[in-house]
Amino acid sequence: MRHRVGGRKLQRTSSHRLALFRNQSAALIKHEQIITTLAKARELRPYTEKLITLAKKGGLANRRLAHSRLLDDTQLKKLFDVLAERYKDRNGGYTRIIKAGIRASDAAQMAVIELVDRDTTAKGQDSGPVQVEEQENEEA
């Protein structure tokens, strides 16, 4: 019997599911809005909200805990510096799920998961490390 067993398996092993949540939460923190299936969005929501709550609490131990769940230093910095400050007065409910129709190829229900009060300029931009182009010496 599986009474009170929470969470969806999403047709994946536990390690694959964990990798999926890590990658999608990093993408959500980076772009502040992603499109995925409704089932994945519903499972991603508590994972991401717990990360934001850890960031709001601050501290070295919480930063290390968040790093073990996120594994992306640039998104970890954004999580603790930008998002924790943005949601300091909000008690939960940091994400929103909006249904986005049905995918044509396999009829899967799609959804947009986004951060509430998001920065609209973050969508589609690369907030990763800045690529510095090397300037060639013209003294040849």
Swiss-Prot record:
The keyword NAD does not apply. It comes from the Bacteria. One of its GO terms (molecular function) is structural constituent of ribosome. It holds the Pfam family Ribosomal_L17. Transmembrane segments: none annotated. One of its GO terms (cellular component) is cytosolic large ribosomal subunit. NCBIfam families: L17. Belongs to the bacterial ribosomal protein bL17 family. This is Large ribosomal subunit protein bL17.
